[in-house]
Design a protein with these regions (language model features):
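Short beta-strand-centered aromatic/proline hotspots
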Residues: 94-98, 109-115
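Glycine-centered tight beta-turn/hairpin loop motif at sheet-sheet or coil-to-beta transitions
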Residues: 104-105, 132
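Short solvent-exposed strand/turn elements
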Residues: 122-142
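Structural motif
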Residues: 80-81, 97
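Short, positionally conserved secondary-structure boundary motifs
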Residues: 2-78, 87-92, 106, 116-121, ...
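Residue-level detector of beta-strand face positions
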Residues: 66, 98-100, 126
């Protein structure tokens, strides 16, 4: 009587062995991680480009950065790779949008909100972390919004 025996072969990722698109290999798109972005206080971006492969091409004006810090947890964990879209001109994004803010000395990733200043009574834009252990950046004067958060990469491989 014949018995089935396990084959001894190197492990191959299931997505490669059994592609999700019936009979077609999964497409991958190469892109560069262009640097790091702080999720904490403003910090200078260290540019350490490296290549990754992801399941979709980057759109026009999109780029990938690595998040450093815990101020956007749990939504965007420390060390995550995120896709950002360049933001170059008015209007200011809608409140609630996660943005890349650059004050000329450093960049940070925060949620953009509007609220009334208790002292002046004026409504102002504020950069708010998602993690309540971190403080808001107020006011948002002297800098600009340079990018809009699009998504956190989950399915990618290092080059």
């Amino acid at each position: 009587e014949r018995q089935l025996r396990p084959m001894h072969s190197p492990l191959v990722p299931l997505v490669r062995q059994f592609p999700s698109h019936a009979g077609h290999a999964r497409r991958e798109y190469s892109t560069q991680i262009i640097g790091n972005i702080a999720a904490g206080s403003l910090a200078e971006s260290d540019t350490v480009p490296s290549t990754i492969y992801m399941e979709r091409p980057l759109g026009k004006n999109e780029y990938v950065v690595r998040v450093e810090g815990k101020s956007m947890e749990p939504l965007i964990p420390d060390g995550s790779l995120v896709i950002m879209r360049r933001h170059t001109a008015p209007p200011i994004p809608k409140p609630g949008t996660i943005v890349e803010y650059n004050d000329g000395r450093g960049v940070t990733l925060k949620k953009l909100i509007r609220r009334k200043n208790a002292e002046t009574g004026k409504t102002e834009y504020v950069l708010q972390p998602i993690n309540p252990a971190f403080k808001d950046i107020t006011p948002m004067d002297g800098g600009s919004i340079s990018g809009i958060y699009m998504e956190t990469l989950v399915n990618y491989r290092k080059g």
